[in-house]
Amino acid sequence: GFRDVLKGAAKAFVKTVAGHIAN
């Protein structure tokens, strides 16, 4: 559902931000 999509997007966003901070 829409909530799952939102959760997936949030996870991907956090992963991306964490990656940028790590670099």
Swiss-Prot record:
Q: Which taxonomic lineage does the organism of this UniProt entry have? A: Eukaryota, Metazoa, Chordata, Craniata, Vertebrata
Q: Give all Asparagine amide modified positions.
A: 23
Where does this one sit in the cell? Secreted
Q: What is this protein called?
A: Ascaphin-1
Keywords noted in UniProt: Amidation, Amphibian defense peptide, Antibiotic, Antimicrobial, Secreted
Predominant subcellular localization, coarse grouping: secreted
Tissue localization of expression: Expressed by the skin glands.
Q: Which GO terms describe its biological process?
A: defense response to Gram-negative bacterium
Give the organism, scientific name: Ascaphus truei (Coastal tailed frog)
- Family of this protein: Belongs to the ascaphin family.
Q: In the UniProt record, which is one GO cellular component term?
A: extracellular region
Q: What is this protein's function per UniProt? A: Antimicrobial peptide that shows higher potency against Gram-negative bacteria than against Gram-positive bacteria. Has a very week hemolytic activity.
